Amino acid sequence: MEEMKFLIMNNPWVLFATSATLLISIFLFFRRKSPNMAWPEGPKTLPIIGNMHLLGGTALQVVLYNLAKVHGRVMTIWIGSWRPVIVVSDIEQAWEVLVNKSSDYSARDMPDITKIVTADWRTISTSDSGPHWSNLRKGLQNIAISPNNLAAQFQFQEKDIIKMIQILEQEAKDNNGIVKPLDHLKKATIRLISRLVFGRDFEEDKYVEDMHHAIEELIRISGYARLAEAFYYAKYLPSHRKAVRYVEELKQIVKNLIRPFLSVNPPTNTYLHFLRSQNYDEEVVIFAIFETYLLGVDSTSSTTAWALAYLVREPSVQDRLHQELDHFAKQNDRKILKVEDMNKLQYLQAVIKETMRMKPIAPLAIPHKACKDTSLMGNKINKGTRVMVNLYALHHNKNVFNDPFKFMPERFLKVDNQDAKGKAMEQSLLPFSAGMRICAGMELGKLQFSFALANLIFAFKWSCVDDGVLPDMSDELGFVLLMKTPLKARINPRN
C-alpha cells in the first residue's frame, strides 16, 4: 500500500490518470439518469460501484429476489457506475416485457468480450431481432431441429444412452459404486447436436472431447465478461486484457475444430447445409454452429444432473418415478425407454417441470434491451434501456407455488390449466423464457433431458456416496446455472 501511495504521489502521469478515472466515474454517477425517463426505484447506490456492494455473498438471482421484496417487483439496479438495468420479478410485468411487448424489448446488450466468439454478435442469442436473427432462427428450428429431424435422431439417442449406461456401470465397478455423471451427459449431448449440425454420427471421441474442452474453457473465463460489464474501465485492466487474449486463442481453437467440416457436402436436413445455403461468411457459419454447443450442452446436461441430485436427496420421489417407468416398460415391452415415450409419462414430466422450476438453467435469462421507446407499467422506457427478468423470482413466488423452496413434483399433477391457480402456474413457469426470444432449442432440450433422466433412473438406483451426506445443491451462474460441486452419487443396477 505504501509503495502504491508513493508511486501515485511521485508520478504525475499516474496521479493524473487516477484522478481522471475517479472524476469521470463520479461524473457518470451523477449524470447517469436520463432526464426524460423516470427510472423505477431501487436500492441506494454508491459512487463508482453502484449497487455492486449488495450483489455478492450468494447467487445473483437470489440476491435480486430478496431485494425485490424490499424495493418492488420492478426496480432499478446499478451494476457498477454506468450500467443501470431494470429488474422485473413479477409475472404480470414479465409477460409485458417478454410477450405482450416482445418486439419492443427484443434487442440485446452483450459484454464486448463476447463479440470474439459470436462473429461480432451475429448469432441467434446475441444479435438484435431483425432479418438476420429471424433467418438464423428459422433455419435452426425449421430444418435442423424440426419435428421430423428430431424423430430421425431417436435411434441414435437410444444407442447413446445404452453406451452411457455401460460406461457408468464400468465406472461404478472401478470406483466402489460411485460415478460422476455430468461429463457423460455432456458428451452424449455433444453427439446429438453434432448429428443435427453435420448429419453424421460421431462415434470417435476426439471431436467430442475437443468440443467439450472448448466449451468448458469458455465457461471458465466467463467471469471476466461480467467484470467488464460492471465496470467500464475494467477492460483496461491487465487481467481483462489477458482474458481477451485467451478468448482469441479459444476462437482459433473453435475455428480449427469446425472448419474441416465446412468443405464436406452435408445432408440437406442439417444446420450446416442451411448456413452454407445462405452464403454467410465463414465466421457466422462457425460461430452459429458453436453457439448450438455452447448453449445446448451445459444447459441440458446440467439440468439432468440437478434432477439426479434432487432424486438422491428425495428417495421417495425417485421410487415413485421408477415405479412409473418400470410399469410403463413392462406394459410396452421396453428394455429402455424410448424418446417417443416421454410425453406419456406424467410423473416424469412433473419431475422435469419441478427441476426446471427449482433450478432454471438461465435464472436471469439473457438481458433484453428496448429497441425503441416503449413503456412498462404505463411508465416511459427509453430506447436502449436494459431489462432483466428474474425467472428465479417467478418460479419461487409463494402466491403461485405453495411451499416454493420444496422439491415437490406432485404440484404439477394437480394442475387444472383452466382455473386461476393453474393458469398462474403455467404462466409463471418460464425456464426457457417466453415470447419471440424464447429459447430456440427448447423442444430439443426438453426431449434430451427427459430421455436421459428416464433411462438413468430406469437403469440405476441413485443414492448418496456416504450415508447421510446429501448432494451439495449450491449453484454458480456462468452461461448457465451450474452445480458448484459436480454431482457424485452411488449407483446400483436395478435389473
From Swiss-Prot:
Coiled coil: none annotated. Keywords: Endoplasmic reticulum, Heme, Iron, Membrane, Metal-binding, Monooxygenase, Oxidoreductase, Transmembrane, Transmembrane helix. Its cofactor is heme. The chain crosses the membrane at residues 10-30. It is a single-pass membrane protein. It catalyses: (S)-cheilanthifoline + reduced [NADPH--hemoprotein reductase] + O2 = (S)-stylopine + oxidized [NADPH--hemoprotein reductase] + 2 H2O + H(+); (S)-tetrahydrocolumbamine + reduced [NADPH--hemoprotein reductase] + O2 = (S)-canadine + oxidized [NADPH--hemoprotein reductase] + 2 H2O + H(+); (S)-scoulerine + reduced [NADPH--hemoprotein reductase] + O2 = (S)-nandinine + oxidized [NADPH--hemoprotein reductase] + 2 H2O + H(+). Its EC number is 1.14.19.64, 1.14.19.68, 1.14.19.73. It is found in: Endoplasmic reticulum membrane. Heme binds at C439. GO terms for biological process: isoquinoline alkaloid biosynthetic process. GO terms for cellular component: endoplasmic reticulum membrane. Pathway: Alkaloid biosynthesis. It comes from the Eukaryota. Expressed in roots and at lower levels in stems and leaves. One of its GO terms (molecular function) is (S)-stylopine synthase activity. Induction: Up-regulated by methyl jasmonate treatment. Methylenedioxy bridge-forming cytochrome P450 involved in the biosynthesis of isoquinoline alkaloids. Converts (S)-cheilanthifoline to (S)-stylopine, (S)-scoulerine to (S)-nandinine and (S)-tetrahydrocolumbamine to (S)-canadine, but only the ring A (2,3-position) of the substrates is converted. Catalyzes an oxidative reaction that does not incorporate oxygen into the product. Belongs to the cytochrome P450 family. PANTHER family: CYTOCHROME P450 98A9 (PTHR47944), OS09G0441700 PROTEIN (PTHR47944:SF4). This is Trifunctional (S)-stylopine synthase 2/(S)-nandinine synthase/(S)-canadine synthase. It comes from Eschscholzia californica. The gene is CYP719A3.
